[in-house]
Amino acid sequence: MLRFAVLIAAAFAANAAAAAPAADAAAVARIHGGIVDCVGCNLAGADLKNTCVKAHDLHGADFDGADATLMCMSYANFSGATFRGTELSGANLAHADLDGADLTGARMTITSIKGTDLTKVKGLTQAQLDAACGDADTKVPPGLHVATCS
């Protein structure tokens, strides 16, 4: 019975992986190459570790499930972008435009959100803010708070 359950679980996992849209290879290459204005790009599931999109326009981009560990994202426009399940640990989102962005399930350990307005972000939780850090200029939705970066 256990073997049957494992086979069923593997089949469901394979189906889910097949259904998930893969990142656009050309868009990922643009990010890695430093050509970073990428409005509406499909970067879902991409490895974007240690890349930099500082002060560029990526509004409406799909970062769902991407690994953006240590990514330099400060001052960039991510309005309307999706970061569902994205690894943002160590990323620098200082002063980024996240108006209407979706951070549902994003991991934000030691993520800098200094000076960032998060009041219109979707899916933001206190647990995410507890793992991140900001400053006096960081704006969070009512009832939430963020620690100051040291």
Tell me what each language-model feature is.
Residues 1-7:
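Sec-dependent signal peptide recognition
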Residues 13-17:
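N-terminal signal peptide c-region/cleavage motif recognized by signal peptidases
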